[in-house]
Amino acid sequence: MQLCQKEKCTSCGACTVSCPKNAIYFETNEYGFCYPRIDDAKCVDCGLCRKSCHVLNELNGNIPQKAYAVWSSDSEDRKTSTSGGAASVFYNEVLKNKGICYGAVYDSDLKVVIKGYDDNNILKFKNSKYVHSKMGSTFLDIKNQLKDGYEVIFIGLPCQVAALRTYLKIDFRNLILVDIICHGTPPQVYLDEHIHYFENKKSRKADEIRFRQDNEFYFSLKSSNTVKPFVSMHKNLDTYLLSFFEALTYYDSCYDCKYACNERVSDITIGDFWGLGLKEPFKHGYSGAVSVVLINTKKGVSFFDRVKNKCCLLYTSPSPRDPKTSRMPSSA
């Protein structure tokens, strides 16, 4: 059995979860990138891995119907958000309906994994994470919860949303899919090595990591028994962030990402609204971080209607990328 080409693989893990014989496992290459391998002794050529692969199965995307600049009406929520707090508003709406929320979190070893919560642990979803995240058992867990009737929201990278859609094969009415405007992802080992370098240099143990500070990009590490970080490096001085923003350390698939386009594979797309006020005056008396929210499907429209009263929002029309309002380098 042949999986997709390695340079196109996003390391989502759908193939491993779909295999009934546990014949697929992940292997890390010499550069720290993880890719699936098939144990030929266990494989029975059933083809379920290929049917669950979003690279091998084309998905229809949707042009955003509406675009908004959004920030949470809750000032305390905004203080703990690295953007405008749109994701937090979405999570709280699902929790209110006894639903389950999925997103990327740091575990106790500062490794990024996708987790699901049905309580106020959603605080763990906050904080930017500029690294690849492992899905683990997320595919199977979400499938079972959807079948049990729970409302589920999944917020992840476009390739992870596409992977979940392909794995499920059914458009569950109780599933809200939200993708993040992505810049590309380095493997976890690069971040691990960067953290360990500073831990050894400073003789400190890092318990908390941050990539944002006052709406600027900083690499910060903090111990649990201290107030101030023992490392705080601006992105122009930090090798991890510098290589991230210069697009030097991503998975191969990121450099030819088929989801980096106007057509979105999710119900809703969120990200940072860079450049707000540069084209037209922003007269709302608010100077904090702002989220961009793109509504892509009828389900997205319906869900966003449920949370509008918890946001301050400004309607803008979806438009092509403008280099003057972008903080990210273009691949064009």
Regions from the PLM with identified roles:
Residues 202-297, 301, 311:
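A conserved active-site cap/scaffold subdomain adjacent to cofactor or substrate pockets
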Residues 178-194:
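Short, flexible loop segments at boundaries between secondary-structure elements
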Residues 170-180:
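A short alpha->loop->secondary-structure connector
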Residues 127-172, 187:
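Intrinsically disordered, low-complexity linker/loop segments enriched in Gly/Pro
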Residues 8, 14-31, 35-37, 47-64, ...:
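Iron-sulfur cluster-binding cysteine motifs and their immediate structural context
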Residues 315-324:
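Conserved small/polar residues in nucleotide/adenosyl-binding loops
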Residues 41-148, 317:
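Flanking helices and flexible, charged tails adjoining ferredoxin-like Fe-S electron-transfer domains
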Residues 327-332:
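Hydrophobic alpha-helical segments, chiefly the membrane-spanning helices
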